[in-house]
Amino acid sequence: GNNGGDGLVIARVLSEKDWQADVVFVLGEKLSPLAQLNRERLNHSDGVSFIRPDELEGRLKTGYDLVIEGIFGTGFSGALPEKAAAVCRLLNQADGFKIALDIPTGLNCDTGEADKDTFRADLTYAFAAYKPAHMTDAGKAYCGETVCLDIGIE
């Protein structure tokens, strides 16, 4: 979805700043049109690698300084699909500073209800406005510090 598109934009910006970014499409490579556009922009970026979900565990063992999670966004509700839950479990055990985009995957942005495998962020960037879940006890536990970013939406 567009949360993944946001992650792709961040990967591009990081690569432009000479960071190496590894991108994993957890739920497959069927992307929204906007996310697909951002994926195509990365095709010629030397600083971005696309890795398969089955490669992630090994890569995490080598260590990352920063983990940015953008699997699901504000549209999530219910239980996490097993592929996403498995990745969240790996990420939650990994080293590195963890950032969630808008809302951690597994956290319902309206109710604050959290899947047992919800991504645990050190920092969450809320786009445009805080969501109700950011103010709940579960939201505070899974979001870490939450910072609202003005993205030009009024």
Predicted regions and their residues:
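YjeF_N-associated NAD(P)HX repair module
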Residues: Y64-E154
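Nucleotide and nucleotide-moiety/phosphate-recognizing core
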Residues: N2-I71, A79-L101
